Every structure is written in C-alpha cells, then in structure tokens.
Regions:
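Short, Lys/Arg-enriched N-terminal segments with co-localized hydrophobic residues
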Residues: 10-20
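A cross-family phosphate/adenosyl-ligand binding-site feature
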Residues: 22-23, 27-30, 38-106, 110-111
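Alpha-helix C-terminal capping segments
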Residues: 103-109, 136-147
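Short, Asp-centered acidic motifs that coordinate Mg2+ and/or phosphate
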Residues: 114
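Glycine/threonine-rich flexible loop motifs
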Residues: 123-132
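Glycine-rich phosphate/pyrophosphate-binding loops
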Residues: 142-164
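Electrostatically charged, flexible surface regions
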Residues: 163-224
Length: 224
C-alpha cells in the first residue's frame, strides 16, 4: 500500500504538535459517504464541542465498500478545508478502512482517544453492518485498539436533517470517552427518522437478523 500525504506545510505541522500537547480528547472522524456529505459535517460540528478533531475521510462516496482496503494503487491524502472550524481535514482517495489506517499510522502523532464514523445517510442495522463502510471504519479503529462508534440515520436523502440527533451523538460520544468501550468492540448506533418529540430515549439491543431481498435490473447491452 503506497501512500502520498500532501500538507500545507508548517501550519499543519504546528497544529498537529498542538494536538499532541493538548489535554482535550483527540477525536478521529471518518465516514463512507465522502468528506463533503452533510452527515459527516454534522458529526464534525458535534465533535468540535468535545475535543480536538482530525478528519480523514474518502474524497468520494464509498458506500457498501465493507472492509475493503487499497492494495494495488497509490493512496492520495490531501489537506483540505470544507467548513470553518478548528478541525484539521484530510481527504483520502481510498476506502473508509484506508482512511483509518492512514489517520492512525501516517497522519496522527498519537493514537486518538476515540474514532467516530458517520453520520451515515441510511440505516446500518442487521446485515448492513457487513456491507457498511461506515461500520468497517469503526471496526478498523477497534482493531487498532481505539474506542470506536459508527452513527447512522434512517434517512437516505442527501439533505437529511441531522440536527435532531446531534444531542444524542454528543451524549453517547461523551460517555464513551469517559467510560470507555470494551477492547475489541465498537458501537453501532442507529437513529430512526423521527421528530425530537417522538424520540423516547436510547436502547441497547442485539444486532437484528434480517437480509436483503435481491433484485437485479437486467438490461441488454446495445454493444454486444
């Protein structure tokens, strides 16, 4: 796995040293919908309230990539700035699992206190966990010994409303930082698409048993 990390030079070096010396929790943020997706932008805004934030996320959508990693091509990782805020952001040409590997092994100067992935546009319950790039990123962080959480909202729209779930994201992440997550485990948090008044609370449950009904749209190629 070759990698190339392009930075803005001294300013990013200074910021990384600052993070190394900071007493705030160091939070690694990623997703599978791409670094510009509204879900990850909402997640970043919440994480900025809890600690020092480093974002390493795919430069394009990587949904349903599972735990794939890049082997036969070069990974490119570029410093960018999507929104205002104290967070440091990198876009990566690879998969969500690649982003974790790059963040932990190449970009960060110390192991993050927690990794959060999402917020995914759509559910990651049941068998979706196997296909999910969002959860695979969280699991990759867990393999690295980092407490990790994957967040998903049952709303596939690009303009989904994430404001309702922000307080719950903050509460869950804050608790995970304080109390920890058992080693080798990752949390899979799924939010229903509800109004704030309809949300009754947080419930811990087993992974559901379900499967997709496979349907294929068959077409005849005009070039055959």
């Amino acid at each position: 796995m070759d990698s190339k990390v392009n930075s803005y030079g001294l300013i990013f070096s200074v910021l990384l040293i600052k993070f190394k010396m900071s007493k705030k929790p160091l939070i690694l943020v990623t997703n599978d919908d791409g670094i510009t997706a509204p879900g990850i932008r909402a997640l970043i805004s919440v994480m900025n309230e809890l600690g020092d934030v480093i974002v390493v996320a795919p430069d394009s959508p990587q949904s349903a990539m599972g735990h794939a990693i890049t082997i036969n091509s070069t990974l490119h990782c570029d410093s960018i700035k999507i929104d205002e805020g104290p967070q440091i952001e990198y876009s990566c040409s690879g998969t969500p699992a690649d982003c974790i590997k790059m963040g932990v092994n190449e970009i960060l100067k110390r192991k993050p206190d927690i990794c959060v992935s999402g917020v995914n546009h759509g559910s990651n319950s049941s068998i979706n966990v196997i296909y999910s790039g969002t959860m695979s990123a969280a699991l990759e962080a867990s393999i690295e010994g980092i407490p990790a959480i994957g967040f998903s909202l049952l709303d596939y729209r690009w303009n989904a409303d994430f404001d309702v779930i922000k307080p719950f994201i903050k509460k869950i992440t804050k608790a995970a930082i304080k109390e920890g997550i058992p080693k080798g485990n990752a949390l899979n948090v799924n939010f229903p698409k509800l109004k704030e008044s309809e949300i009754k609370g947080i419930k811990i449950c087993r992974q559901a048993k379900a499967h997709w009904v496979e349907k294929f749209d068959k077409r005849k190629s005009p070039f055959v």
